[in-house]
Amino acid sequence: MKKKFAVFAVILSSFILFSCSRSGVVISVDENDLFKLNYGSFEDELNMFDISLTGNISTYIAMRDGFFYIANGESKKIMETNSYGDLLSLYYNNESVRNLEFEQEDSSVSTKKSVKYPFNTLGPIAVDSRKYLYVVDTLPQDRFEHDEENRLLLNNVVLMFDVNGQFVNYIGQQGLGGTPFPIIRKIYTTKKNELVVVCTTNEGLLAYWFNNRGALLYRIPVTAEQIPMPADTEEEEGRYYTSVGNVVPDYNENKLYIKVDFYQEMLDSTLKKNSGVTYRKTLLYALNLNNGEYEAPLEIPAYEHTILNDMSKTTDEIPFDFLGVTENGWFFFIITNEDGYIVQMVQPDGQKIFKRSLTVDHSQVFYYTLDLSSSGIVSGLFVLRNYAKVSWWRTDSLLAAYISN
């Protein structure tokens, strides 16, 4: 089924390969703990304030070509490290970070880089193949704007730094220097070094697609009402409800992938009344931005959560979260379970599905943030009681071995 969608275009000048069945045993992928980060105010430490208190934590991670980029909103700085944890670059607000060893080194011989910028509240971060760095920041309150028509507070921008750490400009809704965004959920970069910004609105999600110079190419609203309904839902009793879970850009093409969960209204046959809703299935839609059409959706198997009682067994289906897509077109989905996470990797045509377990002791973790690289490596920053750690799982090796065969 194809459905036209309104796209606003702006024309401007070593694993053993086991195929996991849906109910089979899930094989674990070894976690590689790469390095630790202490808590504190020094340049190579994280400032997490009091991690025992409730509240939002504004710390995010991205990995590119083996280098890690950590946006630590609590200390208003960004750290670039290698896989050993050596600090290579520091972007910082000089009112929050002082007495830097970086500043004391001879810049003519040092390969380290320090960049001053008046960060406010940092958010998600991304890096392209040029090593241009993009990071979400919140404007000072006196620069907030309001979208009265859509009832939105506009206070997020994306800051753009070049390979030398030079601040280029901030990106808003129209491009360089544009109107601030509503709440930004996530940012992505593509093979062509284009930037995709995904925002949350009162109606759903809103994606902005920019070229590698920060000029707006597409503005794409995504709401539940615009999603094509599967043909089989029209033949069943009980109303269907749609929930848009996430929007992720394709790495190579002008496409957006939209994960949609479908729920069905349950009817009591005796009372002829609604008795609740139940999860039915998850579909992944590809929206072609060149022609505004949805391609045929791909059904994504749900996670089966089994509860064993004394004399019975109950199995519930729970939809996965959409983590991202690799440069080879594999779709990654993830869900939390008692042992850590289950990652489900789906081939572009859906013919092959791998499930792997990522073991994490949730009882020791106060906060975490995950990242999927374009090559298929899952990385994570985990905030523990006495320190934070950066780990990765080489799920890319599994895919590479399968593709080579």
Stretch-by-stretch model annotation:
Residues 20-405:
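Eukaryotic scaffold repeat domains enriched in small/polar residues
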Residues 1-8:
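Bacterial N-terminal signal peptides that target proteins for export
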Residues 9-17:
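Bacterial N-terminal signal peptides
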